[in-house]
């Protein structure tokens, strides 16, 4: 396998900028692509991204508005939101060399197609080799170089290992797997479940209710993950349980914050993207196609769509028939 030294990150938001820093700390040659030319020029000149205030950009990172720069990269990381990833990959595709690893880092399912991010890569750039990076990680923590562990999955184990070595450092610890689908299910489902956890906190239902909701939500994640071919150890690992714990317990999570606002009866934050809000209907369509019951996720989707009040959703969940745990 050829050396994987040149890395291009597509998307200069908080997460993309943090991942560019990860690659730079791993000793790679890094290019950060910004769709907006003015933003690229500003970040390049000031070495500061307003999305990550107070965290200077590594001097070795080249910031560009030229998408063709990705064509000379050994690895491309897609840091666009899940619902915009196809557009980013389609724009990138003509500039990619055949066989280039393209790592998705968004956690979601494409609305309307029910495609996971690696499937979007396969369709939009069929000559690329898809991989997925996911796990308990906030952009601010990663950008500051705080200790973080994630999962990196590719169907080819040798490639997954090579990608881990290309991005890993003392502060950023990827674990490799070939269970691509398990990793993707964990990342997508936990965002929806985090909204439910936030609602519990916003409604002040107590720590016991939060623990119960998180645990039962994890059961839903595992059921769907296994039905889609994911492995139990992946779902119970960093990209499943680990990410669920983080996202259901920290206000840094946009999905958790959305749930808190909903539970309090406050307007939803308009300046923060919640992947879970977009993923919820696609997740339920996927579950229905595999005859998997997901009552917590279903409640979230109904609340977001205005089909059910929060009090009605809580009542529905608390009056379900008693059953064995599992």
Curated annotation (Swiss-Prot):
Q: Which family does it belong to?
A: Belongs to the NAD-dependent glycerol-3-phosphate dehydrogenase family.
Where is NADPH bound in this sequence?
15, 35, 107, 139, 254, 273, 275
Reaction equation(s) it catalyzes = sn-glycerol 3-phosphate + NAD(+) = dihydroxyacetone phosphate + NADH + H(+); sn-glycerol 3-phosphate + NADP(+) = dihydroxyacetone phosphate + NADPH + H(+)
From which source organism is this entry?
A: Nitrobacter winogradskyi (strain ATCC 25391 / DSM 10237 / CIP 104748 / NCIMB 11846 / Nb-255)
A single Gene Ontology biological process assigned to it is:
glycerol-3-phosphate catabolic process
Q: What is this protein called?
A: Glycerol-3-phosphate dehydrogenase [NAD(P)+]
Q: Where does sn-glycerol 3-phosphate bind?
A: 107, 135, 137, 190, 243, 253-255
Any GO CC annotation of this UniProt entry: cytosol
EC number of this enzyme = 1.1.1.94
**Which residues act catalytically here?**
190 (proton acceptor)
Q: In which pathway does it act?
A: Membrane lipid metabolism; glycerophospholipid metabolism
Quote the Pfam families the UniProt record gives: NAD_Gly3P_dh_C, NAD_Gly3P_dh_N
